[in-house]
């Protein structure tokens, strides 16, 4: 599996990103497992993103655990307030 790819404009701070991932947005204080796609203008903060997850463009994820094989559509906000939010949206799949 190829290493993670950080495209121009991506910003990753205090995060661990698994192999096969493609990062186009911002990732802070988070753990991303293998084959995670972070779309353009996405923000991921204080979250755990499991294997094979697709985050569409302009998505905001904070204080969440996103389950494996999940697709988050573009322009979506998931924010856990006061506790961790678990997100499972299995609507579409993609391959990296």
Report each predicted region and the residues it spans.
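Left-handed beta-helix
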Residues: 1-96
């Amino acid at each position: 599996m190829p290493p993670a790819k950080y495209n121009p404009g991506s910003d990753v701070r205090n995060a661990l990103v698994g192999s096969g991932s493609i990062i186009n947005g911002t990732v802070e204080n988070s753990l991303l497992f293998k084959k995670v796609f972070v779309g353009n203008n996405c923000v991921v903060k204080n979250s755990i993103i499991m294997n094979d997850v697709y985050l569409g463009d302009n998505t905001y994820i904070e204080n969440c655990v996103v389950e494996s094989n999940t697709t988050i559509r573009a322009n979506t906000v998931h924010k856990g307030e006061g506790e961790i939010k678990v997100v499972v949206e299995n609507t579409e799949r993609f391959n990296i």
